Amino acid sequence: MSTPLIEARNVTKTFGGGLFDKSRTVALEDFSFKIDADNPSVTSIVGESGSGKTTLARLLLGLVAPTEGEVLYNGKNLENLSSRDRKQFLRDVQVIFQDPFEVYNPFYRIDHVLDTPIRNFGLAKTEKERKDLINEALEAVGIRPEEILGRFPHELSGGQRQRIMVARSLLLRPKLIIADEPVSMVDASLRATILGSLLRLNREFGISLIYITHDLTTAFQVSEDIMVFYRGSLAEAGDVDQVVRNPEHPYTRLLVGSIPLPDPDMPWEGERAIGRPAGELGEVGEKFCKFTDRCPFAMPMCVQSDPPLYHTHENRVSSCFLYRESPTIPMTEMTSIFRSSNRQGPVQDNVSFDALDAELEVSTESSSSASSNDD
Amino acid sequence: MVEETLSTEQTEVETDATLQVRDLHVYFHTAAGAVKAVNGVNFALKKGERFGLVGESGSGKSTIALSLLRLIKPPGRIEGGQVFLNGVDLVSLTEEEMRRKRLDEIALVAQGAMNSLNPVRRIRDQFMLAFQDHGIDVKRSGINDHIGDLLSRVGLSRDVADMFPHELSGGMKQRVCIALAISLSPSVIIADEPTSALDVVVQWQVMDTLRRVQEDLGASVILIGHDMGLMAQFVDRLGVMYAGRLVEIAKVKDMFGDPLHPYGQMLIASLPSLEVKQDRLQGIPGITPSLLNPPSGCPFHTRCPKMMEHCKTVTPVLQEVREDHWVACHLYEEAK
């Protein structure tokens, strides 16, 4: 197997805990992960606030350095890349942040955010090339270029702004896009279109995606593999269909049971999905399962050591002693059980993007009628 | 033309209604002109009913919440219409009369309400302040028991009364806000996106709490938000807002099973589920119209796949096309 594009090796990140500060927060604990660029994949990272999912994204982007372990780009440590490698890294790995309002400078027209990467990376030699690149990228995400170019950020909806960020990433033809809660600040009716545009980048341009979210429903819709985090530790990972439909780890069961499904006939169990916490289990050791205090199945062993990864099914692992009959698998091998790691070539499915293309047509009509209203 | 349709618009007639909103108009007067945030809204709330209002941002749903409490601040103004609460028109009350109604008869659990707690006051003091404001003698014996009861009703320990807000988690603070909202047993509780800042497990806890206290009290609830899943699981009836108007009202099962308005249909169709993987991710194409210059005729005609010629000029009226299922769309006019 070739060198992975991005690899995290036994990464731990703690905050605080300086010389005079006794309080130390473990944001992410001993986590390993690989992304192989030759096999475009869509992986979701799911967890509640404080689960470490954004810390992981920032580690993979090189925005923070790990406390222990290392993050590698093409086999080289991200902390001491040569300037050439660094530039290539900034091109290969793109990010889309949560807030489509904050990333734009309100004084510049939309064109600025698209021109900057073209200029910085010398993507176009002529003016025509520049225009073609921008038009192609915008149309891929279902936006008519003439409708947004020359406008200011405040004139566009959150959904449009977020899709322009997707188009901006596409300009650079990256190998990996990390999308950190890209739709959580956007209206529900616009979410599907943004996720559709991200998915098209994966299917049509072979770009891998890491989709970070607290929303299991959209994670289920877009990804192949999922990783569920709880307080800085991996609780469960694997094939998204299996994990969501038949969760193993008690935390994942709680999470799935808490989702209000948009169907009045479906139950909404919340905590009733798993039951009440087991209660006192005695002295808590140095290592323990983070979910113990909320877990109805907790046993004395759960507070004495932290559970390893159990390889429960072909495409999934769970970090819970309930599955101690299953063989264990080292953290560093975790991604080998992913569906994307065991597939040859691109994803085979029949996801259609005609909705995005239809958007191009509808927006012409609405823009013409909107301008007639302005008179 | 528009004025004419508004005045002839049918109102949902409810005799046993706790709250009845009739032809409500709320405009924000800006330098560029009047923004018609709420443009002729009618609905009624039965006793003990849970009613949902959904819509995208800027559809006017939060403006409705604030105008029911008469908390609209300039440049916003209630331009017309009535809000009957237990038979009294709130719009015509004086400021002082309205102040007494708030919390006592109609209470609000706001979006991010947990940030509305005073950070330097103990939880007990925040209750005391509310009681004092409504002329309740806080020195009388038993007041601490009452606060303790309120806290335990929302599933918190009585000791929480002596804590400061920063000692509580987001979900606990939101439950304190629910306890505050029910402290004077109001007949209507307005919950404006009460869980939008919370994680899904905590969201369930908060909504479960709200449902329990609402049922105990026999109060009606208006839940405002854009999470269709939350609506499906919590409300009895649902109203869909679009560009300042209510375009559809139905029982929650009918709304999800058989939406009538094209906007409602697209909204339901765009919902991701955990059952099947959709082979196309489709949102609602186009953008929300500006409320400064709303489109003529039906506000949805610029995005509607079933648009007809007269949709551009004639504003459809909300009417009952099936039992308990109201829709404002020209498609259903012949059906009636």
Protein language model features and the residues they cover:
Chain A
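P-loop NTP-binding/switch modules centered on Walker-like glycine-rich loops
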Residues: V186, L190-W268
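Helix-to-loop junction immediately C-terminal to a conserved catalytic motif
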Residues: L61
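Short catalytic/signature loops enriched in Gly
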Residues: P4, D239-L356
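Conserved ABC transporter NBD signature motif
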Residues: A37, G69-N77
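A short, proline-enriched helix->beta-strand linker immediately N-terminal to the Walker B motif
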Residues: L171-K175
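ABC ATPase NBD coupling module
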Residues: F20-K22, L78-Q94, H112, N120, ...
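Conserved ABC ATPase signature
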Residues: F152-L156, Q160
